[in-house]
Amino acid sequence: MEKSGKFRLTSLERNWILYDVGNSAFVLMVATLIPIFFNALAESGGLSSVEYLAYWGYVSSAVTIITAVLSPILGTVADTKGFKKPIFILCVFVGIVGCCAMGAASAWLPFLVIFVIAKVGFSGSLVFYDSMLSDVTTPERMDEVSSRGYAWGYIGSCVPFVVCLGLVLGAGSIGISQMTALNLALLLTAAWWLLTTLPLLKSYKQLHYVEVEKHAVRQSFARIGHTLRHLPEDKRVFWFLLAFFCYIDGVYTIIDMATAYGTALGLDTTGLLLALLVTQIVAFPSALIFGRLSNKYPSAKLIPVCIAAYAGIAVFAFFLTQQWQFWVLAVIVGMFQGGVQALSRSHFAKIIPPEKSGEYFGLFDICGKGASFLGTMIVSAGSQLTGSANVGVGSLIVLFIVGFVLFRVSCKKEVVPE
């Protein structure tokens, strides 16, 4: 990870970014090969294409509900001195073991149960990973470091993915079944995730924290109760979270359900996977560009640009019927995906108390990190009610419009120092 210009990453910042490289491989698997694995099991179980898309969406929503309950609780406990790293390790362990175990499922229902466990572990780890940003860098460097995290996550995750894709597409030529190839792909992804996590575990130290008290867990519940009661008083945080809930729900729905959407439309599997690989490649320089732009323009100006672009993406997806259109969609998503994620993370990190970063990022996670609730429900319900996947995905434009308006409101409530 060579740096250009005057900006130089510290060793700790590089190790923090490296975790993004690891967990992003799992994200890419969830967006590409895991839905194909589930589709094969669903077909053998007699599910229709519409039922397949609907169940995938409902499971994604279930993950978000579980994570929404656990994240603020665990995040608040993790703010206590010495707690953040152990809980982070636990979540990573659950995610990695779940990733390995998915390959053992022989029916669609057990597969979904294991997937929920793995995704909850993954989503939980992101609460603590994101909250570490205030410990690994300074406020003036957050936009750039956060953007580089997403950028290297996108391009770094392509390394195991290309190998996994080669295994799946070339399974017959090397004498193994496609299901065996998918099992190997899951194991490879888990190994990559583990190896890229170790440097952060070795170097990270919790700098901002709440001192250890008697009955730490009970006190953590008291702190989060106090924060929730008084959250509306901090208007810059309150209105941002409302806006973030809407627009990031749409973003993560597109990420999580892209392959399932294309499959439901009957598009070629190989073309879909290669198009999503292009998304990762395009997202790498795009995220870096947004990081550089953040040195010149405040995130309050850049985030609305990304939201507006996603509204256009939802409209385009409504009319999508052919594979070449999916390729265009993949490129456009790649241009703005990293920017909206990275800038939202760093924007939030700068407006919250650093010693309560775990607690606040638990709330941040509820609003859509890892998997989306409202967005996936909109897509699933819309698809089932109309019999058209296009209508379901196109309906996401509502989330982006509302998110755009609420974000502008949040910026007017109080100027956020950049």
At which residue positions do the language-model features occur?
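Juxtamembrane intracellular "pre-TM" segments in multi-pass secondary transporters
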Residues: 2-13, 205-242
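Helix-loop boundary and gating motifs at the non-cytosolic
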Residues: 6-64, 236-268, 272-275
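A membrane-interface helix-boundary motif in multi-pass transporters
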Residues: 49-50, 168-191, 381-400
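Helix-to-loop junctions at the C-terminal end of transmembrane segments
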Residues: 69-83, 285-298, 383
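Structural signature of the two symmetry-related core transmembrane helices
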Residues: 86-101, 301-316
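Helix-loop junctions at membrane interfaces in 12-TM secondary transporters
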Residues: 102-115, 318-330
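Glycine-rich segments within core transmembrane alpha-helices of 12-TM secondary carriers
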Residues: 146-168, 365-375
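Multi-pass alpha-helical transporter architecture, strongest
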Residues: 192-203, 394-418
